[in-house]
Amino acid sequence: AGGVKKPTTLSMIVAAITAMKNRKGSSVQAIRKYILANNKGINTSHLGSAMKLAFAKGLKSGVLVRLKTSAGASGATGSFRVGKAPASPKKAKKAKSPKKKSSKKSKNKSNNAKAKKSPKKKADSN
């Protein structure tokens, strides 16, 4: 039962905000209405709680930004915009380079060990 993987609630919220193109941000009610209209098979009884969790996760990670006009609001209230995504590719490059260095060192050690063993064998044969 591989089926089609449904998008996450956060990705549906981001898609709704970008599609509405509202300069003053998009309200939670408008986002909910857009998601229900454009995504089939959404469980309406669980959408409210899923949206609350997605808004909290999006605000914490910086994917979503609450507008200054609704700064006093908490939870899934007020207006939201799409924030700037954090730059993660730089971290991936740094993680790859030390692994390459360690593999080079291990190759050199194995070559040195082989070179030391071969003269001993010649000495034994004499």
UniProtKB/Swiss-Prot annotation:
Ranges of compositional bias, category Basic residues: 90-120
Keywords for the protein's UniProt record, in alphabetical order: Chromosome, Developmental protein, Differentiation, DNA condensation, DNA-binding, Nucleosome core, Nucleus, Spermatogenesis
Tissue and organ distribution: Sperm.
PROSITE patterns, per the entry: H15
H15 domain: residues covered: 5-84
GO cellular component: nucleosome; nucleus
Post-translational modification: OE2 and OE3 are produced by post-translational cleavage of a common precursor.
Localization (cell): Nucleus; Chromosome
Presence of keyword Nucleus: yes
Function, in words: Linker histones are implicated in chromatin remodeling and/or transcriptional regulation during spermiogenesis, the process of spermatid maturation into spermatozoa. Protamines substitute for histones in the chromatin of sperm during the haploid phase of spermatogenesis. They compact sperm DNA into a highly condensed, stable and inactive complex.
PANTHER family reported for this sequence: HISTONE 24-RELATED (PTHR11467:SF36), HISTONE H1 (PTHR11467)
Protein name: Sperm-specific H1/protamine-like protein type 2
Biological source species: Ostrea edulis
